[in-house]
């Protein structure tokens, strides 16, 4: 509740001027209508795992990636895009889910070499290393970023103006 109250000014995309970014926040991040697999996928998970999993499901459904690199939540991601393949060794990765454990800094450097303007990276538990999240948002490889408190979403389309949105999720 305290997290929600501290971010109340960032509800439902208020203050976002870009129609594309607003649409992503409103209809992917904060979508409340049930999707076709909501009742089945992750029904036995705890509330936060399920909340994040359903977000990852919606992102995969929206992006329709060909290749996914993931540190977890494969069932949610696969339900979001049935045709996606999980392959950490692919030359190009469309969707990345990264947990901040192990040598995540060097992994991100490698990921930067495998993404394109259409790719999306989800970094889970960004509060674990706030300085790392700031580095990601300021990095020359990244474009639009979304801070959802529990995770961060990174877009790589650098043709657009760089922004970091704080979203009440």
Feature names for model-found ranges:
Residues 1-117, 126-169:
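A short alpha-helical cap/connector motif
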Residues 120-122:
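Structural detector of well-ordered beta-strand residues that form the stable sheet scaffold
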